[in-house]
Amino acid sequence: MIRNRGGAIIVQEGKIALIKRIREGETYYVFPGGGIEEGETAEEATKREIYEELGVHVKVEHLIAKVEYKGTEYYFNAHIIDGVFGSGKAEEFKLKDRGSYIPLWLPIHELEKVSIKPYEVVGSICNHYKK
């Protein structure tokens, strides 16, 4: 299914916020975010999805990467401004047939060592945070 998506790159104290997925015997990581609803901008979708998935409100800043992966995906630098990380109540977290969703902080230097989807974003993140 092709769907445009907004995602957040949240880095704090040398760690990046990710969601660990365990599904059908496969373990991989994704950047928090989700589908852009009709009438929403990519930035608005990113804020909404981050709250649903992580339980935090974010300030969305500049675009770090734009990737074609099952639709156009926009990844923004974002900072947590309120909330409790890991307290998200997204519907997909409750559906057993969707596998496990585990919000976590991964040391940014380990980003290139894990299975991450879409991997194309990793280079942009590494370049951005080496500045």
Give the label of every model feature segment.
Residues G14, G34, R48, L106-H109:
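Structural detector for helix-capping/boundary residues
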Residues V67-E92, L104-E110, V121-Y129:
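Active-site-adjacent beta-strand/loop module that shapes the phosphate/pyrophosphate-binding cleft
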Residues M1-I16, E38:
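Conserved N-terminal beta-strand and adjoining loop/helix that marks the start
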Residues E24-T27:
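A conserved beta-turn-beta hairpin within the catalytic core of GNAT-like acetyltransferases
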Residues E92-S100:
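An amphipathic, aromatic/His-enriched active-site/gating alpha helix that lines ligand/cofactor pockets
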Residues F31-L63:
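The catalytic Nudix box helix
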Residues I10-V11, L18, A78, W105:
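Conserved hydrophobic "DFG−1" position in protein kinase catalytic cores
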